[in-house]
Regions:
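Helix N-cap / loop-to-helix initiation motif
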Residues: 21-25, 46
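A short glycine-threonine-serine/GTX helix/turn-capping micro-motif
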Residues: 1-2, 23, 51
Length: 93
């Protein structure tokens, strides 16, 4: 929950920066995450295939993906999971 909430907040903040009203930005971000999660669960597709299916060559989505990669998004997400796991282990001992 917290990781996805932070991602939703960041998506909405980006949209607000581009001029979208806050209420619409939050709703659109939530709809995007919900729709993608539903597709992942229902289709059984690998998430890489889902990403590739919506990234047109030279398009807007791949530009956004590139920005996420440059910012270390994937690494930060992995580090968050590992940190939470390590904290769980520490609390058990």
């Amino acid at each position: 929950g917290a990781f996805v909430s932070l991602f939703l907040e960041a998506l909405a903040d980006g949209a607000v920066t581009c001029g979208l009203p806050r209420d619409k930005a939050r709703r659109y971000a939530a709809q995007m995450v919900l729709g993608t999660a539903q597709l992942a669960l229902q289709s059984g597709q690998h998430t890489a295939a889902m990403k590739d299916a919506v990234c047109s060559p030279g398009g807007t989505t791949i530009a956004g993906v590139r920005a996420l990669e440059r910012g270390g998004f994937r690494s930060a997400a992995m580090k968050a999971v590992i940190a939470a796991y390590e904290k769980t282990l520490a609390l058990k001992s």
